[in-house]
């Protein structure tokens, strides 16, 4: 198993949930955490523990992004007018690597980060190699022509594992998508329950 796959499944085991709904996730066959103490009976979590778990789960889902990046996203959401939890999710979903993953150009969010890093993606006709790049409504995201025949891309597009959300308009044949609008939390096709309100409580306490 590659280091990247190992990291992904370690997050699943730590959270005790199949974060991305992947059929090969180890939690499909066992429900305890990683390591030699993973099978110990879990005690009831404190409010802080639940808040921390919610934060770690959301960070993990988006490719285990750094605390610095995640906190910066929260700070931006809290400065904007509106529901901070909804805004946090909208900002996370507008990341370029998240949109590339939603479009099924790649099989995992980890692969999406690497795919963007390696220069395989254009935004509005310009190559962008920053996974955390913030897309705006109306932006056109596409796989570069030279990268469209990659087995990774073709296999991911054929996968039935994920549904395309309504806030992304995809032309799968052209490998091009438009980020239509910022999503509402209820629209995001998470495979598990996310609790952004607990994340807000974590940073607000």
UniProtKB/Swiss-Prot annotation:
Cited NCBIfam families: PRK05327.1, rpsD_bact
Family note: Belongs to the universal ribosomal protein uS4 family.
The protein's name: Small ribosomal subunit protein uS4
Cellular component, GO, one term: small ribosomal subunit
S4 RNA-binding domain boundaries: 94-173
Gene3D superfamilies assigned to the protein according to its UniProt record, in alphabetical order: Ribosomal Protein S4 Delta 41, Chain A, domain 1, RNA-binding S4 domain
Native species: Maricaulis maris (strain MCS10)
Chain spans, region Disordered: 1-44
């Amino acid at each position: 198993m590659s280091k990247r796959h190992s990291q992904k499944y370690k997050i699943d085991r730590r959270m005790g949930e199949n974060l991305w709904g992947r059929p090969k996730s180890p939690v499909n066959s066992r429900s305890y955490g990683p390591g030699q103490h993973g099978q110990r009976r879990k005690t009831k979590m404190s409010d802080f523990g639940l808040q921390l778990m919610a934060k770690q789960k959301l960070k993990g889902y988006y490719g285990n992004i750094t605390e610095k990046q995640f906190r910066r996203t929260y700070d931006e959401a809290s400065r904007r007018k509106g529901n901070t939890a909804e805004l946090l999710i909208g900002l996370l979903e507008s990341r370029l690597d998240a949109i590339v993953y939603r479009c099924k150009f790649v099989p995992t969010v980890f692969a999406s980060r690497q795919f963007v890093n390696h220069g395989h993606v254009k935004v509005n006709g310009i190559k962008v190699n920053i996974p955390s790049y913030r897309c705006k409504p109306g932006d056109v995201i596409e796989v570069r022509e030279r990268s469209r025949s990659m087995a990774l891309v073709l296999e991911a597009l054929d996968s039935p594992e994920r549904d395309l959300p309504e806030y992304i308009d995809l032309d799968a044949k052209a490998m091009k998508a438009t980020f239509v609008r910022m999503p509402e939390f209820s629209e995001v096709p998470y495979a598990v329950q996310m609790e952004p309100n607990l994340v807000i409580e974590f940073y607000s306490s």
